[in-house]
């Protein structure tokens, strides 16, 4: 189980969960709500770092937003920096999957001195819904099915069984081999979604574009993506790699949106090799 912490910052009180040993690593997602059961993506990093899994404003037991603008991506980054300061870290690492990766990019751009490294998995620096290869594009054959699942998941009246069934269906759409779902998602981990944060994200994201700022990122960056990702298609990871100087890009040929589960051994070794190279560089300095 992950250990809960309530942190008071200059921007309010935030709930986070910690696990692992090593240098501090920040991890979050734009609209997920975490708890003591943790997170599959976060688990990968607990062998190399002390992971801080953060419930953002309006998620879990963190401070509530007074106005929707407080849920914007840039305000979220200011919240993360305030949490770092409250924890008395001068720097920390960051790893993010999907919208978590999007936040990681913006963090590295906004506070270039705060991150020792950045891992971005299945994310994008611009509106990934603009391509019909993305399931969130109206031309995608599974667009309406996915929208129906998302809207149903927003309901506060779902039973735990109903929520689990809807979440399973939503996740299976984003697996290269859906039949392997049970072998990937076997841990007693349960998360929920902050409807307010999801709605704020959907309002902001169509106008979101960090392409021109990627070249300013100096943080050591690893970018990975499943070759068959239908949420954040691989072309967006390639775009990030081309925009961020000296970044490393590793595609996962037999994965969709969850390479850390679909090709777990390969993903773990890729992550560990990345951090090993960072330590070697720091030793040589």
What are these regions (language model features)?
Residues 217, 223-225:
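Short beta-strand/loop motif that positions the catalytic acidic residue
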Residues 247-285:
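Catalytic active-site module of serine/aspartate enzymes centered on a nucleophile-bearing elbow/loop
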Residues 101-112, 118:
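Short glycine-enriched nucleophile-adjacent loop
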Residues 154-204:
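Conserved alpha/beta-hydrolase catalytic His-Asp/Glu region
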């Amino acid at each position: 189980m992950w250990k809960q912490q309530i942190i008071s910052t200059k921007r309010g009180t935030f709930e986070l969960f910690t696990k692992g040993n090593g240098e501090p690593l920040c991890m979050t997602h734009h609209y997920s709500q975490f708890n003591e059961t943790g997170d599959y993506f976060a688990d990968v990093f607990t062998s190399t770092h002390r992971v801080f899994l953060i419930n953002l404003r309006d998620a879990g037991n963190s401070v509530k937003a007074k106005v929707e603008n407080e849920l914007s991506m840039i305000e979220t980054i200011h919240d993360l920096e305030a949490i770092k300061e409250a924890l008395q870290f001068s720097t920390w690492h960051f790893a993010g999957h999907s919208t978590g990766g999007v936040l990681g990019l913006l963090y590295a751009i906004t506070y270039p001195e705060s991150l020792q490294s950045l891992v971005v998995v299945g994310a994008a620096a611009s509106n990934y819904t603009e391509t019909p290869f993305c399931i969130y594009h109206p031309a995608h054959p599974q667009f309406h099915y996915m929208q129906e699942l998302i809207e149903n998941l927003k309901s506060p009246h779902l039973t735990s069984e109903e929520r689990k069934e809807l979440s399973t269906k939503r996740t299976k759409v984003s697996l290269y081999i859906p039949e392997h779902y049970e072998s990937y998602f076997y841990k007693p981990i349960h998360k929920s979604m902050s409807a307010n944060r999801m709605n704020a994200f959907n309002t902001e994201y169509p106008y979101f574009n960090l392409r021109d700022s990627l070249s300013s990122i100096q943080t050591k960056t690893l970018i990975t993506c499943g070759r068959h990702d239908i949420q954040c298609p691989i072309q967006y990871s390639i775009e990030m790699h081309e925009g961020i100087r000296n970044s490393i890009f590793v595609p996962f040929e037999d994965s969709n949106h969850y390479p850390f589960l679909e090709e777990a051994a390969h993903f773990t070794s890729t992550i560990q090799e990345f951090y090993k190279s960072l330590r070697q560089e720091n030793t040589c300095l």
